[in-house]
Every structure is written in C-alpha cells, then in structure tokens.
C-alpha cells in the first residue's frame, strides 16, 4: 500500500445557462493495485460536507466504483453508456438514485498516477436530473 495525493474536482451543472456548483478536495490517500484495479482510500472533509466519512475508489480501465461509508453511505458505479441504481443513505432518510454515465476517461499509468474523468447524470426518484462532472487526479 502506497501513499498518494488525490485531488477531486466535482461540478454540478445547475441550469441550462451552464451555471455550476464546484467543489475541490485535495487529500492524502492510500493506493494499491489488486491485480484488477487500483484501490484508493481517503477521508472526506468539511469541504465536501461529509466530514467523518470514508471513501473507497475502485478504478478499473472501463469503470469506477465509488463506495462512501459513514453517516452518508452509497455505492456508485460509473461505466460509459451504462446506468446503475442505488440507495443513498443519509441521516435524513434513504433516497433512490440512478446514475447514467455519459463519459468515462481513464488515463492512469501502470503505477496508478494520472487522472480519471467522468460525466454523468443523476436521476432522483425517476424524474429530476442533474448533470455532474468528476475529475480525479492521482499522484
């Protein structure tokens, strides 16, 4: 297991004019390769409004699985042109959420350094959609 510096930039497109909400997290993480994928573990912070939570990224060449554990818990799977459904658990209740991955761009080298870029839509309760973008830089 190696230490890594991870920068995660998330953007949520708020309206048709392209206004966005942007959050950037730079954190220390652990990184390992299990023969199939890179596993990145890190702690969330106040910046992400998820302080106390832990996040695990399982990064494959063709998909990424994000598991959040703590008072907010969920498992999100991102694979280009695929949809997945999940339960998002919060202190305020549980919500059904669907994810539709539009773009998945894997640019990691053999040591797991580089970036992963994802664009996806979140569908809440089958009707309300939001476009989201994630850029994960790993060094």
Describe every region a protein language model picked out.
Residues 85, 135-139:
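Flexible glycine-rich active-site/ligand-binding loops centered on an Asp-His dyad
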Residues 1-117, 121-129:
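N-terminal intrinsically disordered, cationic/polar leader segments
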């Amino acid at each position: 297991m190696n230490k890594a510096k991870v920068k995660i930039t998330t953007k949520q497109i708020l309206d048709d004019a392209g206004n966005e909400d942007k959050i950037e997290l730079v954190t220390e993480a652990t990184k390992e390769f299990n023969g199939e994928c890179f596993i990145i573990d890190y702690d969330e912070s106040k910046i992400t409004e998820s302080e106390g939570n832990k996040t695990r990224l399982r990064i494959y060449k063709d998909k990424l699985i994000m598991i959040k554990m703590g008072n907010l818990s969920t498992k999100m799977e991102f694979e280009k042109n695929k949809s997945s459904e999940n339960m998002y658990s919060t202190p305020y209740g549980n919500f059904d959420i669907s994810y539709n991955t539009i773009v998945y761009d894997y640019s990691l080298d053999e040591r797991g350094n580089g970036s992963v870029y994802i664009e996806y839509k979140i569908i809440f309760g089958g009707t309300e959609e939001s476009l989201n973008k994630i850029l994960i830089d790993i060094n």
